[in-house]
Amino acid sequence: MNTFGNIYRLTSFGESHGPGIGGVIDGCPAGIELDTAFIQQELNRRKPGQSRITTPRKEDDEVQFLSGIYEGKTTGTPIGFIIWNKNQHSSDYDNMKTVYRPSHADYTYQTKYGIRDPRGGGRSSARETIARCVAGAIAKLALKQYGIQIQAYTSQVGPIKLAGSYQDYDLSLTEKSDVRCPDPKTASEMETLIAEVKSKGDTIGGVITCVAKGVPVGLGEPVFGKLHAALGHAMLTINAVKGFEYGDGFNAAFFRGSERNDRFFNDNGHINTRTNNSGGIQGGISNGQDIYFRVAFKSVATILMEQETVNMEGEDTILKARGRHDPCVLPRAVPIVESMTAMTLLDYLLIQKTRENF
């Protein structure tokens, strides 16, 4: 499927080394002020060539809107857009045309479709996620009207991780480091590790934490449309994602109800909770507390080291990849996680609004 969402929907198209990546957004509310500078800023956070710890591929990543906008506002009709690819080095993939990269989508795409575009991974490339960042930026602008804010950050790279919870850090510092970690000391250690891994032609994974504040009570559609299930689905569609947990996640298995339950209390006329182990979601429905979750990313499959593999004829061979690749996806994946979160929350907010007049 190339379409995400129920009411607020994105259909993306394009390949890594094709002419461009684009999309069509349907179901966007009319009248949203389209802050093009903000949208470009979001794309810049994701684009390649940002620092020594990202891919050296250089792209302008400037979005061109084709429809659905008049005098700077959304019209409620489909929003078409495209971002042109300008810096492809397709010859870097000549030695991969008939060879499968270990842990990459090469083999599964070839087997499923009987054909694949080997240049940069084609449709399986994370280059596709730029379309999500456009749709996510517009979703953020819509959510801003409801006081909903989303902030993601790198909380772990390999064995190096932040201690404590998101509440222990000033998340406004996230964008001040190349790795997008809000703690300067830990960020420096992460960047050093990524640079070391890159120098050896290897890659490394990690974890991104995301927090959504200001989400009202009531978003989520039991029983098969639970909000945490929707967020999990959204995250697991992102390239290289291998795990998702919200609230206290797997740690919930180690505690008794008397230890873990989020107790309610009257907070000056408002219902609040003493703790937030549930991660802002109970029974699949938002409860008004901060929604927070973690997303685990594997190391990038394409490494510049010799690997045992097979070719399309099933013959054993050795592959040493070439090209420009991220040694760690985390720095550029932070805005992607935020975008998928924004799209999901706006979608579920619009679903909830269909109930208000009944």
Curated annotation (Swiss-Prot):
GO terms for molecular function: chorismate synthase activity; FMN binding. Pathway: Metabolic intermediate biosynthesis; chorismate biosynthesis; chorismate from D-erythrose 4-phosphate and phosphoenolpyruvate: step 7/7. FMN binds at R123, S124, S125, N239, A240, G283, K298, S299, V300, A301, T302, R324. The keyword Lyase applies. It catalyses: 5-O-(1-carboxyvinyl)-3-phosphoshikimate = chorismate + phosphate. Belongs to the chorismate synthase family. This is Chorismate synthase.
